[in-house]
C-alpha cells in the first residue's frame, strides 16, 4: 500500500533525489560511495596543482538535523553529536568549539551512537539515518565504526548492508557484548535488517532477530539491572520515488529475557493491525518493570503512549494526550528520567514532558516563542543531574539546566543541509542557499556566523 497523499506532493527532496537517481528508483550505495571518494581524490589533486583550496563559508549559527547525542557525566565538557548527513562532531568545552571526527568515512549519515559505560573515549557509531522522512533527504549507511581514542582513529566493524543503524546498546557489565538494531535500506527491501549481537566488541556479529526483508528494528531498550532483558520495536517500512508506506502488520514490540536467544511478541493491551507505524521504547532505570512505548500509525498520526508495569507482559494507556504533527514517523523517541520513573519525555514536533507517569503531558520546547526549533530527534539526560538536558532537533543542539523550563541554543555546528546555493557575482561575499528544514538563507559578509533566514520554513 502506498500513501497517495505523498505521491502528489512535490517536495524538495523529490527534486534532489530524482536528479541523482535517474534513471533508477534508488541511489545505489556503491555509486554514492565511489563519487565521494572521487571528490576526495580530486581535492587532493587540486592541492598538488596549487589550485586555490576550498574555504569554509558557514553557517555556524543556524544548525541542522541532529540524530543522536552522547555525553559523559564524569567529563561534563565532552559531547558527541551525530548528524543527518554531516558526520560526528565532538566538543570538549560544552559546545564552545566543535571538531569533526568522522570525516574520513565517505558516508556521513549517522543513525545512532553508543558511548562505553566506563571509558568515554570509546564510541560506537552506526551509520545511515533511521528517520525515513517524507519531505527530506535521508541516506543509508555503510555499517558500524568504533573509536577507542575519542575519534582520532576508527575501526570498521562491518554490517555494510544494514541500511541504517537505529540503535546501539552496550552491556553495562560486559562491554564486549554489543547489540545493534538495523532498519535496513530505505529505498529497497533487503535481508540485512533486524537485531545483531556481538560478543567481542563488534569484531563479529550474529543476526539474532529477523522478521522479513521489509521489517526492520527502529528502537531497542535494555534493563540495565538485568542486561539480558531486552525490548525492541519492529517497523514495517518502505519508501520509493513514488510514495511511502510507513506501517504494517510487521510493526510491534518484541522482548527477550535471555540476551536475544528467544524473542516473543508483547501485545496485550497494545494496538495491532496493518496501520501500526513507528514505535519508540524506554525502560526505567529505577523501576525496570516499567516500560514506556510511543505509538504512531502508518500515516504518521500519533496513537498514544503506553506503559507496562510488569516487564511488558501487559500494557495500559495512561491517558496523557500529545498533539500530533501528522508526520510523527519523523520523530518517535521516548525517554525516562534515570532517577524518577514518573518523569517521561516524548519527542515529536515539539518535546513533551510528564511528571506523573504519562497521565498528563505538557510541552517543554514549544516553538511558538521562537526559543527552540521544531522536529525533535534526540535527548540526553545527564544521569548525575537529571535537570541537565541536551536536545537535538532539525535546528541543532539545545541545552536546559532546569529540566526543560528554559533552553539555550549551542551554536558552531556546521551541519546545515543545503539543496542548492547561489553566489552574487557582483558581490561574491554574498551567498544564498535553500536548506532542509532551515529555510532559505543568506550571508552578506564573509563571516561564517552571520547567516540569516530570509524566507521559507
Residue map of PLM features:
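Beta-propeller blade termini and top-face loops
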Residues: 1-457
Amino acid at each position: 500500500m502506498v500513501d497517495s497523499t505523498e505521491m502528489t506532493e512535490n517536495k524538495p527532496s523529490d527534486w534532489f533525489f530524482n536528479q541523482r537517481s535517474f534513471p533508477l528508483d534508488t541511489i545505489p550505495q556503491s555509486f554514492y560511495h565511489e563519487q565521494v571518494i572521487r571528490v576526495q581524490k580530486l581535492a587532493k589533486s587540486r592541492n598538488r596543482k596549487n589550485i586555490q583550496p576550498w574555504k569554509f563559508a558557514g553557517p555556524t549559527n543556524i544548525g541542522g538535523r541532529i540524530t543522536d547525542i552522547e555525553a559523559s557525566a564524569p567529563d561534563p565538557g565532552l559531547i558527541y553529536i551525530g548528524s543527518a548527513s554531516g558526520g560526528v562532531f565532538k566538543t570538549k568545552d560544552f559546545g564552545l568549539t566543535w571538531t569533526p571526527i568522522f570525516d574520513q568515512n565517505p558516508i556521513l549519515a549517522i543513525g545512532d551512537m553508543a558511548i562505553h559505560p566506563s571509558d568515554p573515549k570509546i564510541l560506537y557509531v552506526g551509520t545511515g539515518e533511521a528517520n525515513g522522512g517524507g519531505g527530506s533527504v535521508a541516506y543509508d549507511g555503510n555499517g558500524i565504526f568504533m573509536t577507542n581514542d575519542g575519534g582520532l582513529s576508527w575501526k570498521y566493524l562491518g554490517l555494510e548492508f544494514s541500511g541504517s543503524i537505529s540503535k546501539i546498546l552496550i552491556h553495562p557489565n560486559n562491554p564486549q557484548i554489543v547489540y545493534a538494531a538495523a532498519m535496513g535500506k530505505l529505498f529497497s527491501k533487503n535481508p540485512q535488517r533486524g537485531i545483531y549481537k556481538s560478543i567481542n566488541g563488534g569484531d563479529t556479529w550474529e543476526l539474532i532477530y529477523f522478521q522479513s526483508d521489509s521489517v526492520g528494528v527502529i528502537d531497542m531498550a535494555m534493563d540495565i539491572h538485568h542486561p539480558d532483558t531486552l525490548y525492541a520495536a519492529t517497523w514495517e517500512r518502505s519508501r520509493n520515488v513514488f510514495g511511502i508506506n510507513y506501517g504494517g502488520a510487521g510493526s510491534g514490540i518484541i522482548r527477550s529475557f535471555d540476551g536475544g536467544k528467544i524473542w516473543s511478541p508483547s501485545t496485550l493491551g497494545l494496538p495491532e493491525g496493518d496501520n501500526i507505524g513507528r514505535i519508540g521504547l524506554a525502560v526505567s532505570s529505577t523501576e525496570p518493570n516499567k516500560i514506556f512505548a510511543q505509538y504512531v500509525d502508518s500515516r504518521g498520526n500519533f496513537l498514544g503512549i503506553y506503559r507496562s508495569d510488569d516487564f511488558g507482559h501487559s500494557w495500559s494507556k495512561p491517558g496523557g494526550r500529545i498533539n500530533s504533527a501528522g508526520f510523527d514517523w519523523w520523530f518517535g523517541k521516548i525517554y525516562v528520567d534515570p532517577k524518577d520513573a514518573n518523569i517521561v519525555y516524548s519527542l515529536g514536533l515539539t518535546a513533551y514532558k510528564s511528571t506523573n507517569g504519562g497521565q498528563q503531558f505538557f510541552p517543554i520546547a514549544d516553538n511558538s516563542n521562537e526559543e527552540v526549533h521544531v522536529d525533535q530527534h534526540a535527548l540526553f539526560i545527564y544521569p548525575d543531574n537529571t535537570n541537565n538536558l541536551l536536545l537535538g532537533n532539525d535546528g541543532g543542539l539545545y541545552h536546559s539546566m532546569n529540566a526543560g523550563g528554559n533552553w539555550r541554543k549551542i551554536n558552531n555546528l556546521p551541519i546545515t543541509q543545503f539543496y542548492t546555493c547561489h553566489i552574487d557575482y557582483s558581490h561574491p561575499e554574498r551567498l544564498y542557499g535553500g536548506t532542509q528544514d532551515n529555510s532559505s538563507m543568506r550571508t552578506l559578509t564573509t563571516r561564517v556566523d552571520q547567516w540569516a533566514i530570509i524566507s521559507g520554513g
